[in-house]
Swiss-Prot record:
Protein name in UniProt: Protein-methionine-sulfoxide reductase catalytic subunit MsrP
This enzyme's EC code(s): 1.8.5.-
Biological process (GO), any one: protein repair
Pfam families membership: Oxidored_molyb
Organism from which the protein derives: Rhizobium meliloti (strain 1021)
Length: 313
């Protein structure tokens, strides 16, 4: 696997102002704040994180836009539904079960997850719906967690599941369900272990809001946003490709790989351009060209050498 070549840091990048807590008090404070945040998900703890060289060249999307324009069907299908309907969701206490083809299956509590060395990474995020953002995530490499459980040689894929709590997630209740729960996603093991792939516990210097996937979510910046599964409760290593929610719902529209590709259109719209949220102009003005692999081709294209990306979309 090629080593990551960090892009240059542009002077125009927005670094949000925030304060930092002592490392020991931070872990307890962050976990405690999540527990106390119900039903006020806006109350978030500041997160201590080192500034990584993994930074997009673009200015960050305004925090208000990134936390009020979301896809999280567990809270509703409208873009404003997750922020409006997630106040009763309880992101603490929390555990993530890691099992399957591993030598040391175990559960990770929230304080253990927050204790991983955290970095701020400013990534581009491209939705399959042809809009995008630039978000300062806080998290740690997924590979660091996988190393703790010692994947077996037979493990080829990594499967993920979101929590199911219809009493707290109104999109999971009711007669009509837009998707099958739990929400599931998957990656090849080499994708999961790539340095760009992280588990995020925060954004904009604070713990994740409920509507953005609290308390922990996946971020894979060269893939469409639906691969970034939220509110993860289980990670399993498997030998075969795991089922993925949107791929099951519409296999001709949402592929397993879901790599950002301007040359492969969605059956119902073009993927050649995108609207950057916060800049306006969805119907033509201020649209920008979509980059192969969302601008990360130099670092990840070799993962798919020899593959027909029109077939393996």
């Amino acid at each position: 696997m090629p080593s990551y070549r960090a892009p240059k840091i542009a002077a125009a990048e927005i670094t949000p102002e925030r304060f930092f807590l002592d490392r020991r008090t931070f872990i307890a404070a962050a976990a405690g704040s999540l527990a106390l945040s119900v039903p006020k998900p806006s109350r978030a703890a500041a997160l201590e994180a080192s500034k990584s060289t993994y930074r997009a060249d673009d200015p960050a999307t305004p925090e208000k836009d990134a936390t009020t324009y979301n896809n999280f069907y567990e809270f509703g299908t409208g873009k404003g539904d997750p922020a409006a309907n997630s106040a009763n969701f309880k992101p603490a206490p929390w555990t993530v079960k890691v099992d399957g083809l591993v030598g040391k299956p175990r559960e990770f509590g929230l304080e253990e997850l927050l204790a991983f060395p955290l970095e701020e990474r400013i990534y581009r995020m491209r939705c399959v719906e042809a809009w995008s953002m630039v978000i300062p995530w806080i998290g740690f490499p997924l590979a660091a967690l996988l190393d703790r459980v010692e994947p077996l040689g037979s493990a080829k894929y990594v499967a993920f599941e979101t929590v199911v709590r219809p009493e707290e997630m109104p999109g999971q209740s009711g007669y009509f369900q837009p998707l099958e729960w739990p929400y599931r996603e998957g990656l090849r093991l080499d994708e999961a272990r790539h340095p760009l792939t992280i588990l995020s516990v925060g954004l904009y210097g604070k713990t994740l809001p409920n509507q953005n996937g609290a308390p922990i979510r996946l971020v894979v910046p060269w893939k469409y946003g639906f691969k970034g599964i939220k509110s993860i409760v289980r990670i399993s290593l498997t030998e075969t490709p795991p089922p993925c929610t949107w791929n099951l719902a519409g296999p001709s529209e949402y592929g397993f790989y879901a790599n950002v590709n301007p040359a492969v259109d969605h059956p119902r719209w073009s993927q050649a351009t995108e609207n950057r949220i916060g800049e306006g102009g969805f119907f033509g003005a201020n649209r920008r060209d979509t980059l192969p692999f969302n601008g990360y081709a130099e670092d990840v294209a070799s993962l798919y050498a020899g593959m027909d990306l029109r077939v393996n979309f």
